[in-house]
Amino acid sequence: VEIGLSGNTTRMGRLLAPFGIRYVAVVERSTPSFSDGFDRPIGLRTRQALGSQLDLRPLATDPSVTVLVNESWMSSRAQFGSPVRLVGLDEPGELVVTDLTSGIPVLTDRRSSREQRGFVGAGEVLVAEAYDPNWRLLIGGETIFPEPSFGWAMRFDSPTSGRAALFHIRPD
């Protein structure tokens, strides 16, 4: 966010994509515009930086809040139809030039914050959660351990396609 608001990129959406962020809300008033509230307008530089973003599109909303949709969004649990390099994408500059919009949502049956299920294909599964070695992906009776991705998130290398479960084991 800091890089985007500084004016150093016009692709802030790509920087937010690995976090699974689809919408950005900029609130400038404590209540809707038709009622009394406290104004807290954003600065001109911030307004210009947000307005220059190529992948953050404004939605029609109340004047008290600006909602931007991230056109570079990807699901927080995703696989990619075309090859995308997920290893070594640790620097913001690398993310800005990497298109993650081909991400296909997987593991969409959310049982809890610690368990999701669904179909996955063979290949890398990206999970937009802070890397934690206690996460597991179970597919075809095989348990897969996480690898770091984006310098903070996780990826799992699924050996096969099929029903899968992503779950977290509490440490002892």
Question: Where are the regions a protein language model picked out?
Answer:
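Extracytoplasmic/lumenal acceptor-recognition loop(s) of multi-pass membrane glycoenzymes
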Residues: 1-23, 27-34, 74, 88-96, ...
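Generic recognition of flexible, low-complexity loop/linker segments
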Residues: 10-16, 55-56, 114-116, 124-126
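Alpha-helix boundary/capping residues
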Residues: 19, 53-54, 171
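Aromatic/acidic, Gly/Pro-rich catalytic loop(s) in extracytoplasmic/lumenal soluble domains
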Residues: 24-92
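Residue-level signal for well-ordered alpha-helical segments
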Residues: 2-3, 45, 114
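Active-site-proximal, structured, solvent-exposed surfaces of multi-pass membrane proteins
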Residues: 63, 75-78, 82-172
